[in-house]
Each structure stands twice: as structure tokens, then as C-alpha cells.
Curated annotation (Swiss-Prot):
Catalytic activity: Preferential cleavage: Ala-|-Xaa, Val-|-Xaa in bacterial cell walls, elastin and other proteins
Molecular function via GO: serine-type peptidase activity
Protein name in UniProt: Alpha-lytic protease
Top-level EC class as recorded in UniProt: hydrolase
Entry EC no(s): 3.4.21.12
GO biological process: proteolysis
Transmembrane regions listed in the UniProt entry: none
Superkingdom of origin: Bacteria
Organism phylogeny: Bacteria, Pseudomonadati, Pseudomonadota, Betaproteobacteria, Burkholderiales
Keywords, ordered alphabetically: Hydrolase, Protease, Serine protease, Zymogen
Keyword check for Protease: yes
Family assignment from sequence similarity: Belongs to the peptidase S1 family.
Gene3D superfamilies xrefs: Trypsin-like serine proteases
Length: 25
């Protein structure tokens, strides 16, 4: 559960970062 949650969080975090980066850039 912890590993799966970490993977999901990493994917979501990467998506948010790339979206924020695109918007900022």
C-alpha cells in the first residue's frame, strides 16, 4: 500500500509539476 501510494503520488506530483512548469513557462 505504501509503495503503491508512493508511486501514485510520484505520478501525480510529476503531472502537477509539468503542468505548473508549462503554465509558468
Amino acid at each position: 500500500a505504501n509503495i503503491v501510494g508512493g508511486i501514485e503520488y510520484s505520478i501525480n506530483n510529476a503531472s502537477i509539476c509539468s503542468v505548473g512548469f508549462s503554465v509558468t513557462r
